[in-house]
């Protein structure tokens, strides 16, 4: 049998074998492919006979070889698809799902009450034209204390109150450093600065029902021309009404903070008794909610802001305290213990 006849016979016999194969013959298919098209396969052996052909027949037979290779390659690919489809079908049949079985309820997590409070407060201030600015939790001593008018010998620098990492690096005790950095960069030719800076802060406190070594604060700052105590009071009245009810009133009591002058403690009329006196307000009719004041001129000057031309106010409130007051929570540790029975109450 001449070479051309052998090529035709190889094509026909291989196609016939492939046609007889079922989808379950994956290994047999691979073995046949190697036997026919492999480096030592039948087609390769026939190719060796080209050198013995007359010169005029070599191109003709060579073309036939390529045609047979292409036809068989395509045939093997088609059969491989059949085998793969059969494999998938068998897998589906063996893993059939019973769609009549009742579904299993997926337990969803709860948004933490502190996240809810924080977002609510941020939304209130965003609606008043404030910007929200984040900052570093690991802070320089300079920004945490000196820029807030807290000199080296101030009691707040005591090692018992602050987590120092090194002599000049610490875990921030408030979010005020964010305000200082933002004040440094603000362009007052474009208008006043109105910002809040939410985030975690750290103190060397012993954890108990009312204290935690870490907690959350939102501090606010407004600086511009002709900013007055009346602007501060109006802002505080707005936040108290939004958080505790439209019929709430506030009062300002003189206080002291190094970075504000004058400084005030802010009380809100008790939302449980309406100011008549109860166990929540300790019979006073008022509940302390935050501290505030007019920005100290020294704080402005350290940012290169002319305190003769510009003034401002600042305030700081704690999300934990806001949540405890609103929901009657009596132990701050509940916020951090990860107990779903606690967090799911505030959905």
Curated annotation (Swiss-Prot):
It is an enzyme of class 6 (ligase). SUPFAM superfamilies: Class II aaRS and biotin synthetases (SSF55681), tRNA-binding arm (SSF46589). One of its GO terms (cellular component) is cytoplasm. Gene3D superfamilies: Bira Bifunctional Protein, Domain 2 (3.30.930.10). The keyword Nucleotide-binding applies. Binds 2 magnesium ions per tetramer. It catalyses: tRNA(Phe) + L-phenylalanine + ATP = L-phenylalanyl-tRNA(Phe) + AMP + diphosphate + H(+). Signal peptide: none annotated. Pfam families: Phe_tRNA-synt_N, tRNA-synt_2d. GO terms for biological process: phenylalanyl-tRNA aminoacylation. Mg(2+) binds at residue 261. Its EC number is 6.1.1.20. Keywords: Aminoacyl-tRNA synthetase, ATP-binding, Cytoplasm, Ligase, Magnesium, Metal-binding, Nucleotide-binding, Protein biosynthesis. PANTHER family: PHENYLALANINE--TRNA LIGASE, MITOCHONDRIAL (PTHR11538:SF41), PHENYLALANYL-TRNA SYNTHETASE (PTHR11538). Belongs to the class-II aminoacyl-tRNA synthetase family. Phe-tRNA synthetase alpha subunit type 1 subfamily. HAMAP family: Phe_tRNA_synth_alpha1. This is Phenylalanine--tRNA ligase alpha subunit. It comes from Streptococcus mutans serotype c (strain ATCC 700610 / UA159). The gene is pheS.
């Amino acid at each position: 049998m001449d070479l051309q006849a052998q090529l035709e016979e190889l094509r026909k016999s291989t196609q016939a074998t492939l046609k007889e194969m079922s989808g379950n013959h994956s290994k047999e298919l691979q073995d046949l492919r190697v036997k026919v098209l492999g480096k030592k396969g039948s087609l390769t052996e026939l190719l060796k006979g080209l050198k013995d052909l007359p010169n005029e027949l070599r191109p003709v037979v060579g073309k036939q070889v390529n045609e047979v290779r292409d036809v068989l390659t395509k045939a093997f690919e088609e059969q491989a698809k059949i085998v793969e489809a059969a494999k998938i079908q068998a897998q589906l049949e063996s893993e059939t799902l019973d769609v009549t079985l009742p579904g299993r309820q997926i337990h969803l997590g709860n948004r933490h009450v502190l996240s809810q409070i924080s977002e609510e407060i941020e939304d209130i201030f965003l609606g008043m034209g404030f910007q929200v600015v984040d900052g570093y939790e690991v802070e320089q001593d300079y920004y945490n204390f000196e820029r807030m008018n807290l000199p080296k010998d101030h009691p707040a620098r005591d090692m018992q109150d602050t987590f120092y990492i090194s002599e000049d690096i610490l875990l921030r005790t408030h979010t005020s450093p964010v305000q200082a950095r933002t004040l440094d960069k603000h362009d007052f030719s474009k208008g006043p600065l109105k910002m809040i800076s939410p985030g975690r802060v750290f103190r060397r406190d012993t954890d108990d029902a009312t204290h935690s070594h870490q907690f959350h604060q939102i501090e606010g700052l407004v600086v511009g021309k002709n900013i007055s105590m009346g602007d501060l009071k109006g802002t505080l009245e707005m936040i108290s009404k939004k958080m505790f009810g439209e019929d709430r009133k506030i009062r300002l009591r003189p206080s002291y903070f190094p970075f504000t002058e004058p400084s005030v403690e802010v009380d809100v009329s008790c939302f449980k008794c309406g100011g008549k006196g109860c166990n929540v307000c300790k019979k006073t009719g008022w509940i302390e909610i935050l501290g505030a004041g007019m920005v100290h001129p020294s704080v402005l000057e350290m940012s290169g802001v002319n305190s003769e031309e510009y003034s401002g106010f600042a305030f700081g409130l704690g999300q934990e305290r806001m949540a405890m007051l609103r929901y009657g929570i009596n132990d701050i540790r509940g916020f951090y213990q990860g107990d779903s029975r606690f967090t799911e109450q505030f959905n």
